[in-house]
Regions:
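Conserved beta-strand elements of the Class I
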Residues: 21-23, 121, 150
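Residues immediately flanking
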Residues: 26, 125-126
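VWA/integrin I-like adhesion module and closely mimicked acidic/polar interface patches used
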Residues: 94, 119, 126-185
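Membrane-embedded segments
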Residues: 3-117, 133
């Protein structure tokens, strides 16, 4: 009679991914509701879907408004990264939109990577109004390190509800909203 046996089979697989840093605008202009529920939440949803579709890549997250900081360094632990997306909100740091500073911070996070491909994905409404580094300058720095920069414009042109804090709480008014496509294309 054959006796029952069990075996432990181990399989090592090697996958080769790329390194990606997502740079996300969290300025107050991202609270405009031309996208639902607002620009920031729409950008977070797009970013989370992107992360879920890239299981073999190292992905990091930089956030910026008037200043910039690293929310998550490059990691393959996408569960941690996705949880950190939930914590992102406008008002975490000084307001304004320093696109160049956010892009430069993303470059510093990925420039020393040994990956075969290095990519920065910039999610913003593109209206740069702060920072010591111009967006085009930061993009040129990325290019010198062999880093490709892809931009995702978040928003529409026209008018949209925008939240204002009043003595009676938050009220919404229609304001002119735009997306700076010229800067994003450069």
């Amino acid at each position: 009679l054959a006796r029952p046996q069990s075996t432990d089979n181990w399989e090592n697989t090697t996958t080769e991914g790329i390194d990606i840093v997502m740079a996300m605008d969290i300025s107050s202009s991202m609270l405009a509701q031309d996208l639902k529920p607002n620009r920031l939440e729409a950008a977070k949803d797009v970013a989370a879907a992107f992360v879920n579709g890239r299981p073999n890549d190292n992905i990091g997250l930089v956030v910026f408004s008037g200043e910039s900081f690293t929310q998550c360094p490059l990691t393959t632990d996408h569960t941690v990264l996705l949880n950190l997306f939930k914590d992102i909100q406008s008002g975490m740091i000084e307001d304004g939109t320093a696109v160049g500073l956010g892009l430069a911070n993303a470059v510093s996070r990925i420039k020393d990577s040994q990956a075969k491909s290095k990519v920065i994905i910039l999610l913003t409404d593109g209206s740069n109004n702060m920072g010591e580094i111009a967006p085009v300058t930061a993009a040129e720095i990325a290019k010198t390190f062999g880093i490709r920069v892809y931009t995702i414009g978040v928003g529409t042109q026209g008018e949209a509800p925008y939240p204002f804090q009043t003595a009676f709480g938050v009220q919404y008014q229609n304001v002119k909203v735009e997306i700076d496509e010229k800067t994003l294309n450069e």
